[in-house]
């Protein structure tokens, strides 16, 4: 993605036409929807043009249908699609997923204003607006599990985004929307169309209000059959197309994941830390049966601290579209807000080293996300205020996840797997415990015992401390980050973290670590730290994190054709990384759209540490 990667929101004019307020793009000089009736045009061109009423109504149980769109705009097309889905969807576990791209997203205020026109869509508009993402580049997944509907909204330039998309599932239908080719020629470049076809398959359909030559030629180059039925309103024609013909040599069919079609899957998840819990939840939300195994008790490892802070280290804005921590932070906030265990907060991130680099982020990110303000605790260090953050109560989250009717917890020590036909047997000693369709191993460093050639995960000891501060409590909705962190654990106790000792796996609570945590807060907030009780009165918990050699989680299959996957190596950011990475894992296993770009998926790939076997060159003896 190019360096000018700061997302600019759309600049709009507004015009009343036949009593409807129509938004007009200043950037492109074109309307966002038809002046005749935008909703009726959407139904005529995109829904009918892709024969979606019949196709959606006939989806089989657990079938996954995806619709791609080239310009999100006001979201009108997606809302009309969602409304149709409500009307015709079969009473089974089929799922509808929409993928859309937008270079200039509307501000939330403008989106509310634009969608206010459509009374019949207001219940859906409200749900969309509640999850409408921050104006940051990259993929934003919006999930509506009760509707069996989801949206991947990619913010950025279509010329950069479509080549970066991973093809884990072919798109079934396309809305070729966006402003007219004469107003927005970049949208209709051959590179964009090539990648739209790459993400498709035989049987994929296409529809557009435009019959411009550049679009017709771009599709015909790949053997796609085009027809031109009557357009909407005053428009004589529209484009309707289906991919029937053999593909050209330039764009060969890209293979997709081995999908498990149209049946409920039984998934075994080994390990009930945050990696295992989030993975179990992701499968269960899709209607699959999950058996979650834990050797002792859920959250007995590094995930079991009294509190987890969602505290991202932000990157320069031009890297945000493929930066795991930034993308995970946005996804995690949307994920955890569905649980009572989540508490929205703001975080004062103190600038200790390279202070100007941190302060510069406040100028790069939207002002309502990151700002510079005076710290509420006296300190000599400058800081930025991250207004979109959160804290999670791990044990409350565990209880909520385990209440899911499709998740069963079993206490057992799984020691081996036996694969046969399309199943995997899980064994505890010599006894078969379960047969599953797929297994996901989430056992941190102990995952290595269940695989050959597993990457070496480094142990990192960490201890959190908590202490009575009822005499000087901090705001409940605020945390402080300074190399360590502190915030209210409850109304009378302060939690502080965390020590960080690589290559140590001891888990005893130590006074030295309390001293370490005290020295961290004292170095930044000395006046406040002096009020705290002596460290001998502190309580704590020590645990061991698992860290991969390159600091990225290990996600996916260790062998290409295997039904056994892994998810481990989350380090100290487990609660931040887990929700997004579990969606990536599920996409690979079930054959769904992947919510991260190729570049990031390669960094997560569980096979990335395996040595590549180089073919031997033939040896020729000289004569």
Swiss-Prot record:
Record's subcellular location: Cytoplasm
Molecular function in Gene Ontology: flavin adenine dinucleotide binding; oxidoreductase activity, acting on the CH-NH group of donors; tRNA (5-methylaminomethyl-2-thiouridylate)(34)-methyltransferase activity
Start and end residues of each stretch annotated as tRNA (mnm(5)s(2)U34)-methyltransferase: 1-244
Record's catalysed reaction(s): 5-aminomethyl-2-thiouridine(34) in tRNA + S-adenosyl-L-methionine = 5-methylaminomethyl-2-thiouridine(34) in tRNA + S-adenosyl-L-homocysteine + H(+)
Region (FAD-dependent cmnm(5)s(2)U34 oxidoreductase) location: 270-623
GO biological process: methylation; tRNA wobble base modification
EC identifiers of the protein: 2.1.1.61, 1.5.-.-
Pfam families (UniProt xref): DAO, Methyltransf_30
Coiled-coil regions listed in the entry: none
Cofactor(s) for this UniProt protein: FAD
Broad class of where this protein is predominantly found: cytoplasm
Domain of life, per lineage: Bacteria
Keyword Flavoprotein carried by entry: yes
InterPro entries assigned to the protein according to its UniProt record, in alphabetical order: FAD-dep_OxRdtase, FAD/NAD-bd_sf, MnmC-like_methylTransf, SAM-dependent_MTases_sf, tRNA_MAMT_biosynth_bifunc_MnmC, tRNA_MNMC2, tRNA_S-uridine_synth_MnmC_C
Family, as annotated: In the N-terminal section; belongs to the methyltransferase superfamily. tRNA (mnm(5)s(2)U34)-methyltransferase family.
HAMAP family found in the cross-reference section: MnmC
Protein's name in the database: tRNA 5-methylaminomethyl-2-thiouridine biosynthesis bifunctional protein MnmC
Native organism: Acinetobacter baumannii (strain ATCC 17978 / DSM 105126 / CIP 53.77 / LMG 1025 / NCDC KC755 / 5377)
Gene that produces this protein: mnmC
């Amino acid at each position: 993605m190019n360096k000018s990667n700061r997302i600019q929101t759309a600049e709009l004019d507004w015009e009343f036409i036949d009593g409807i307020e129509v938004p007009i793009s200043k950037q492109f000089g074109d309307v966002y929807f038809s002046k005749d009736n935008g909703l009726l045009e959407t139904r005529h061109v995109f829904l009918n043009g892709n024969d979606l009423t019949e196709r959606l109504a006939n989806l089989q149980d657990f079938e996954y249908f995806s619709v791609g769109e080239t310009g999100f705009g006001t979201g009108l097309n997606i809302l009309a699609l969602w409304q149709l889905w409500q009307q015709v969807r079969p009473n089974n576990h089929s799922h509808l997923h929409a993928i859309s791209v937008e270079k200039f997203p509307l501000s939330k205020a403008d989106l509310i204003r634009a969608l206010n026109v459509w009374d019949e869509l207001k219940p859906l508009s409200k749900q969309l607006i509640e999850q409408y993402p921050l104006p940051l580049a990259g993929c934003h997944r919006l999930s509506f599990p009760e509707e069996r509907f989801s949206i991947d909204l990619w913010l950025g330039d279509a010329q950069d985004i479509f080549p970066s998309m991973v093809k884990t599932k072919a798109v079934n239908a396309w809305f070729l929307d966006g402003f007219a080719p004469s107003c927005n020629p970049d949208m209709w470049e051959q590179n964009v169309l090539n990648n739209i076809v790459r993400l498709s398959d035989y049987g994929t359909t296409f529809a557009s209000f435009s019959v411009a030559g550049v679009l017709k030629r771009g599709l015909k180059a790949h053997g796609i059959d085009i027809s031109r039925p009557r357009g909407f309103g005053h428009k004589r024609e529209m484009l309707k197309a289906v991919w029937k013909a053999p593909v050209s040599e330039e764009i060969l069919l890209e293979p997709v994941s081995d999908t498990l079609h149209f049946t409920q899957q039984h998934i075994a998840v080994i390990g009930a830390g945050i990696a295992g819990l989030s993975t179990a939840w992701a499968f269960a939300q899709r209607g699959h049966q999950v058996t979650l195994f834990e050797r002792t008790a859920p959250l007995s490892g590094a995930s079991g601290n009294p509190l987890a802070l969602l505290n991202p280290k932000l990157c320069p804005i031009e890297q945000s579209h493929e930066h795991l921590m930034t993308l995970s932070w946005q996804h995690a906030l949307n994920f955890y807000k569905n649980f009572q265990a989540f508490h929205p907060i703001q975080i004062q991130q103190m600038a200790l080293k390279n202070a100007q680099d941190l302060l510069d982020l406040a100028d790069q990110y939207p002002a309502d996300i990151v700002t510079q303000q005076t710290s509420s605790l006296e300190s000599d260090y400058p800081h930025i205020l991250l207004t979109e953050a959160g804290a999670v109560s791990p044990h409350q989250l565990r209880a909520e996840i385990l209440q899911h009717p499709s998740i069963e917890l079993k206490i057992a020590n799984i020691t081996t797997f036996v694969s046969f036909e399309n199943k995997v047997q899980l064994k505890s000693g010599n006894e078969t415990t379960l047969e599953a369709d797929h297994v996901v191993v989430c056992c941190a460093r102990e995952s290595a015992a269940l695989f050959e050639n597993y990457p070496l995960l480094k142990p990192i000891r960490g201890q959190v401390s908590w202490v009575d501060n009822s005499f000087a409590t901090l705001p409940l909705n605020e945390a402080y980050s300074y190399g360590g962190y502190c915030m209210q654990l409850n109304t009378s106790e302060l939690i502080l973290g965390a020590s960080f000792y690589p290559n140590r796996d001891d888990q005893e609570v130590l006074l030295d670590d309390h001293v370490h945590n005290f020295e961290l807060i004292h170095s930044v907030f000395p006046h406040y730290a002096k009020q705290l009780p002596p460290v001998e009165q502190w309580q704590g918990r020590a645990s061991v994190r698992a860290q991969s050699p390159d600091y990225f989680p290990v996600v996916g299959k260790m062998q290409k054709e295997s039904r056994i996957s892994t998810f481990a190596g989350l380090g100290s950011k487990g609660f931040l990384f887990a929700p997004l990475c579990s969606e990536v894992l599920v996409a690979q296993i079930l054959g769904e759209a992947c919510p991260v770009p190729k570049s990031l998926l390669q960094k997560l790939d569980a096979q990335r540490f395996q040595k590549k076997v180089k073919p031997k060159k033939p040896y020729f003896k000289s004569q």
